[in-house]
A protein has these predicted regions:
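N-terminal metal-binding scaffold of metallo-dependent hydrolase/deaminase domains
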Residues: 1-37
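Short amphipathic alpha-helices and their capping/turn segments at secondary-structure boundaries
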Residues: 39-42, 46-49, 110-122, 204-208
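Divalent metal-dependent hydrolysis catalytic cores, especially in the metallo-beta-lactamase
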Residues: 61-63, 81-110, 123-136, 163-174, ...
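Active-site gating loops and adjacent loop-to-helix segments of metal-dependent hydrolytic enzymes
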Residues: 61-66, 73-76, 85-96, 137-163, ...
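Generic structural signal for well-ordered alpha-helices
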Residues: 80-84, 108-115, 156, 181, ...
Length: 212
């Protein structure tokens, strides 16, 4: 057991000075005023550093010199490990690896890799973010137009069956219809609107169906 001292602590609710973080068995046991520390506990000074909960990046295509969605060879556990190490240098402890519009085969590979990574490294990546392929072509941005398409039942069912490793799907609601949105949301996937040219009516229908 030891205490981290002489840092400014941001809890998410308040800013604490003259406090310590007590660590026991690798976990935070408590946060307390310095004056309440047991006299015998080891103190490790942080020399005025800022202490806060780790940041979470909910859309990360690549970092650390790698891209998760470049080629099939890049969609690997090793790529995700490199991204995790790069994230930690700037205080980002968790993230959603993001695979942009691609073929069914590459999406399924990404899902398999995500499952393998989560089994090997729990509590780092928080699941896969599939950005596309059900986007509006006029708002595709840098997404490959060859793979921008409307949903098919087989892929939707596959995604729902693997919802335990797919955290988020970004889609254009006017391209999918409400049934697909409802099905994904019911499976526990966060559905986000993006790369969309929806009318107000189409957008409202999408939000009612489960877009958050």
């Amino acid at each position: 057991m030891y205490a981290l001292t002489h840092g400014r602590i941001y809890t998410g609710h308040e800013i604490l000075d003259d406090h310590a973080i007590v660590i026991a068995n690798g976990l935070i046991e408590r946060v307390c005023p310095l004056a309440e520390l047991p006299p015998e506990i080891e103190q490790r000074s942080l020399n005025g550093a800022v202490i806060s909960p780790g940041f979470i990046d909910v859309q990360l295509n690549g970092c650390g010199g790698v891209q998760f969605n470049d080629t099939a060879d890049a969609v690997t556990v090793k790529t995700l490990e490199i991204m995790q190490k790069a994230n930690e240098k700037s205080g980002c402890t968790s993230y959603l690896p993001t695979l942009i519009t691609s073929s069914d085969e590459l999406m399924k590979q990404g899902i398999r890799v995500m499952r393998e990574y989560l089994a090997k490294h729990p509590n780092q990546a928080l699941g896969l973010h599939l950005e596309g392929p059900w986007l509006n072509m006029v708002k595709k941005g840098t997404h490959n137009p060859d793979y921008v398409r409307k949903p098919d039942a087989e892929l939707v069912d596959y995604m729902c069956a693997n919802a335990d490793v797919i955290t988020k799907v970004t889609l254009a609601p006017e391209m999918t219809g409400t049934d697909v949105i409802s099905k994904l949301a019911a499976a526990g996937i966060v559905v986000s609107a993006g790369h969309s040219n929806a009318t107000l009516k189409e957008a409202k229908a999408g939000f009612r169906a489960g877009i958050t």
